[in-house]
């Protein structure tokens, strides 16, 4: 929003439609191979062989999601330390939260889905509400920005070419639409629910991001949104909107977002490596499950690996962010 203002909603909508077509493809593949554990990796295995499948799974999912999880849980620990626990090391907070979600996922997909439903409901509800307050200009601050007076024109953003260049950025807001696939076999009606869940998720994300973006442009100038001195334009918006209460609320939203990512990565990556173990692309120990059907080896290895990165302090460095964006 900071670079091209509300024009960003156009590439956001276009990318949502493109991701819906991707969702249709995944739903069709799931219909053809409904019992696979690893999802994308086993689709690649059937179509291209073991080596592309191994490389694709590790590079596109396992490594990327480990780095994503590290960044999210580190941010979550920093926010909790800053808001509620100033005297506790943020690394300890992060590892405790990771351990909590490890236990939740060890109880199987039923507990995972119940926790995820609660987290997502609170997250989406909070984002919509804080966005609508901004859209309707109901904040306690009198510092309402006159967006129309400073809005960039179609020519200033580079026209159609400029809009297309921001589609790449918009794609990041829809990453993970296919993460339903590794747990699809545990659904009661996967033929219906796989595509339906992806469709609902995409529409909700578009709606929430649009509302939040419009709200932000009413209380924060485009220059600050693009180049916030603190590097946290969402916190600046919340503070301008509702003062210290807004800052705390946005901090809680940040924690909920991290919790959702952590929970999803645990569930999806453990199932992906389980599928790879079943196909002989990973040690067979990864294919083992506990009595509740959870791929416990993958879950524990994921916890140990990420906890080690966090404990070493690497999770708070720019290196993780650089690798993640790369």
Where are these regions (language model features)?
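Transmembrane helix-loop boundary segments of multi-pass membrane transporters
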Residues: 1-9, 75-91, 110-120, 249-252, ...
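Extracellular loop-to-transmembrane helix junctions
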Residues: 1-93, 201-204, 211
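Residue-level signature of transmembrane alpha-helical entry/exit and packing/kink sites
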Residues: 7-12, 53, 90-94, 98, ...
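Hydrophobic alpha-helical transmembrane segments of multi-pass small-molecule transporters/permeases
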Residues: 12-16, 25-28, 54-67, 98-102, ...
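Transmembrane alpha-helical segments of multi-pass small-molecule transport proteins
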Residues: 14, 83-111, 123-130, 144-146, ...
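TM-loop-TM module centered on a large, flexible mid-protein loop between adjacent transmembrane helices
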Residues: 41-45, 49, 82, 199-263, ...
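Membrane-helix boundary/coupling elements in multi-pass transport proteins
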Residues: 59-74, 174, 179-186, 245-284, ...
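Helix-loop-helix junctions that connect adjacent transmembrane segments
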Residues: 87, 117-251
């Amino acid at each position: 929003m900071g670079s091209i203002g509300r024009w960003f909603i156009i590439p956001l909508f276009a990318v949502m439609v493109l991701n819906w077509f991707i969702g249709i493809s995944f739903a069709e593949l799931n219909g053809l191979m409904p019992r696979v554990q690893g999802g994308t990796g086993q689709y690649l295995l059937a179509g291209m062989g073991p080596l592309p499948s191994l490389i694709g799974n590790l590079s596109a999912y396992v490594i990327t999601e480990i780095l994503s999880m590290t960044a999210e849980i580190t941010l979550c620990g920093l926010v909790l330390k800053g808001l509620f626990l100033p005297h506790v090391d943020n690394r300890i907070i992060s590892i405790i939260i990771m351990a909590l979600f490890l236990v939740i996922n060890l109880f199987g997909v039923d507990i995972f889905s119940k926790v995820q439903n609660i987290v997502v409901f609170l997250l989406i509800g909070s984002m919509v509400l804080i966005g609508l307050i901004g859209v309707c200009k109901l904040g306690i601050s009198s510092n309402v920005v006159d967006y129309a007076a400073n809005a960039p024109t179609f020519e200033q953003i580079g026209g159609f070419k400029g809009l297309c260049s921001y589609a790449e950025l918009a794609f990041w807001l829809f990453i993970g639409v296919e993460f339903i696939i590794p747990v699809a076999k545990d659904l009661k009606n996967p033929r219906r629910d796989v595509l339906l869940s992806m469709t609902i998720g995409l529409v909700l994300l578009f709606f929430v991001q649009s509302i939040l973006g419009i709200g932000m442009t009413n209380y924060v100038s485009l220059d600050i949104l693009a180049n916030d001195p603190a590097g946290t334009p969402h916190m600046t918006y919340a503070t301008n909107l509702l003062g210290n209460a807004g800052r705390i609320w946005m901090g809680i939203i940040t924690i909920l977002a991290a919790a959702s990512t952590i929970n999803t990565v645990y569930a999806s990556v453990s199932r992906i490596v389980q599928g790879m173990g079943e196909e002989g692309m990973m040690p067979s120990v990864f294919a083992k499950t506990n009595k509740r059907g959870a791929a416990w080896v993958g879950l524990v290895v994921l916890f140990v690996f990420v906890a080690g990165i966090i404990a070493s302090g690497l999770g708070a460095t720019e290196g993780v962010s650089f690798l993640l964006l790369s």
